[in-house]
Amino acid sequence: MKKITLLVLGIVFSSLNIGSTDAPAELFILESNGIHSYDPLINAIFIHESGGDQFAINELEMAVGPGQVRQCRVDHYNKLMGTSYTLSDFFSFDLTKEMFLYFTCHNGNGNPIPPKTYEKASKDWNGSGPMTITYWNNIKALL
């Protein structure tokens, strides 16, 4: 693998024509694992909300899963996405993460927005009001 990488790098660098007046060379990313900038925040929220328990249920709030999703959020997500998820679908780490990321990069009407800060994303996940400050402090301590 090392030899292949060196060979590819050699080919790329030899094609750069450093010092040439020709058009600038193009570099390509051959492989990327992607950017997961919200993963630490999502993990902290899941630990805070459910202790990381995928099958957690809060009967008082009727919230389920690792992110403690409630029916009103499922309904809102379904409306914006044109999906028909049920509350029990959100026992899934992946689906809950997908929902979190959607609401982190879209406003309440489903329009794309610039990605939120960790603080704004966590407070919005929690809800609204003064308790979101305490919530953020708890999440921040887990980061």
Predicted regions mapped to residue ranges:
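Signal peptide cleavage region of secreted peptide precursors
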Residues: 16-21
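Sec-dependent N-terminal signal peptides
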Residues: 4-13
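Catalytic glycan-binding domains that act on GlcNAc-containing polysaccharides
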Residues: 22-143
